[in-house]
């Protein structure tokens, strides 16, 4: 029996169920989304440590824009906050970050944070 650990080159995850998780724990939805962002942070660190070359995170779909203005606003605030944190994690772990998708509906400051994240990690 071969017991050698095989590490995949590419792992893709879809962020889904944060609101249901929060509801099950009797928490507001925004805390479920925050927990999802924290899980992504940990996943980025773990993937880098394990030598996973590519990590794709599907984090926000066009359907999410149909949520309440309050929930979308909370998500955008989380994205701005975690873009800054992810920059530190990416630099510390030699990770390159590339956002794929439509940015036109994001606020100017969020787009700038994403651009900075991509630019400052492009050589990793």
Regions found by a protein language model. Name each.
Residues 1-124:
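Flexible, compositionally biased loop and terminal segments
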